Amino acid sequence: AFRAAGGGTGLSMDIDEYDTMEHPYKQLIVWNPEAEEILGGYRYLLGTDVRFDEKGAPILATSHMFHFSDAFIKEYLPQTIELGRSFVTLEYQSTRAGSKGLFALDNLWDGLGALTVVMPNVKYFFGKVTMYPSYHRRGRDMILHFLKKHFYDQEKLVTPIEPLQLETSEEELNALFCKNTFKEDY
């Protein structure tokens, strides 16, 4: 599904070193038992399973994108699941499958919730959100501005190595999101 939107490795199978390393990421799969097919999934790694390189940096699929503070590594990572490579198969995406597509995504999120039940030490999910080049830039900028305004990481727990540059003017974004709370701005 992500390949159709411009993602993936470009190889015949989207497997990388994080799938094959000594302590690999796990897969959360949504399965349709009647049709015997996969509807969607997430790749994930428990923070308690994270290994560290010789410099003490966490070996994560997002390590090339983010700097992780010592506070994040010590206080949050042990209670975190890193998520990545989420997908809903094309046949179950809402534009093609109607309500079945919504249920596939809902079931995927239910699976994430189930992980927190079987692993009660987990309090946080972390991961990157991919917005492909085809994604409308103004829409992307609106999302990024909204998140930065209302959910800014004051402690700088996780910071981007190369911050995204907004193309939409700050004036326009401030005019769109001019309320005091995220609920009012939403």
Kindly give the residue locations of the regions a language model identified:
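Short amphipathic alpha-helix that is part of the acyltransferase structural core
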Residues: 1-46
